[in-house]
């Protein structure tokens, strides 16, 4: 099954040269794919367009077999494709770790009991149960990164978009993150400047250069 298909995506920020000039991409169920390219090439922009967080100037976004055009079209997409932002502080906004992780399931209409059960399961699966009642903003950068992943996995997505997931991670937490991600069943689209991490998790690579994916 094709999870995500981007066709001839074009995008420019107002007053600036085009960032994307005909970028096309396809992600299949279970596939793991890395996107490389220099800073400012448009990799993060491509992720945001894929989830309807930005609107392309031209081109089409198709997810789960349906073309997505307006905000309402992307509600389902954001339930089924999880995005791990480059900066964990953009994603963690509740007082405690448990509340951050429960937010997604509650937003999907789960009961409080169901959401709390999901918190326990996700933290147990990731061996992070010791962080459950911690104050989120007091976590280390590495802990925040792992909790951010937990918040996304609590939504039970079918694919993950990972934007520089090793940022702020020490060697130990990077190895732990790789171990966790390698054991997941989801399709993964990875942006990372870490060649060893890319090679281990998503060795198939496309390059974003001059606004196109090659």
What are these regions (language model features)?
Residues 1-6, 10-22, 71-73:
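A short, flexible loop at the N-terminus of ABC-type nucleotide-binding domains that lies
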Residues 36-38:
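The feature captures the beta-strand-to-loop junction immediately N-terminal to the Walker
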Residues 59-69, 77:
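Conserved ABC transporter NBD signature motif
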Residues 160-163:
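Catalytic Walker B motif of ABC-type/P-loop ATPase nucleotide-binding domains
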Residues 135-139, 143:
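Conserved ABC ATPase signature
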Residues 51:
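Helix-to-loop junction immediately C-terminal to a conserved catalytic motif
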Residues 113-131:
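Conserved ABC ATPase "signature" region
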């Amino acid at each position: 099954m094709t999870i995500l298909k981007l066709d001839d995506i074009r995008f420019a920020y107002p007053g600036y040269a085009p960032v994307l000039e005909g970028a096309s991409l396809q992600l299949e169920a279970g596939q793991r794919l890395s996107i490389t390219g220099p800073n400012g090439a448009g990799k993060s922009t491509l992720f945001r367009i894929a989830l309807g967080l930005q609107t392309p100037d031209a081109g089409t976004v198709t997810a789960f077999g349906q073309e997505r055009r307006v905000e309402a079209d992307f509600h389902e997409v954001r339930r089924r494709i999880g995005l791990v932002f480059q900066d964990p502080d953009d994603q963690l906004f509740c007082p405690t770790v448990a509340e951050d992780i429960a937010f997604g399931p509650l937003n999907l209409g789960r009961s409080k009991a169901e959401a709390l059960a999901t918190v326990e399961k996700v933290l147990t699966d990731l061996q992070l149960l010791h962080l459950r009642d911690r104050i989120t903003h007091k976590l280390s950068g590495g802990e925040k990164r792992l909790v951010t992943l937990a918040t996304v996995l609590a939504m039970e997505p079918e694919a993950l978009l990972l934007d520089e997931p090793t940022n702020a991670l020490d060697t130990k937490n990077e190895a732990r993150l790789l171990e966790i991600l390698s054991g997941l069943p989801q399709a993964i689209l990875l942006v990372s400047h870490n060649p060893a991490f890319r090679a281990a998790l998503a060795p198939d690579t496309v390059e974003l250069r001059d606004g196109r994916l090659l």
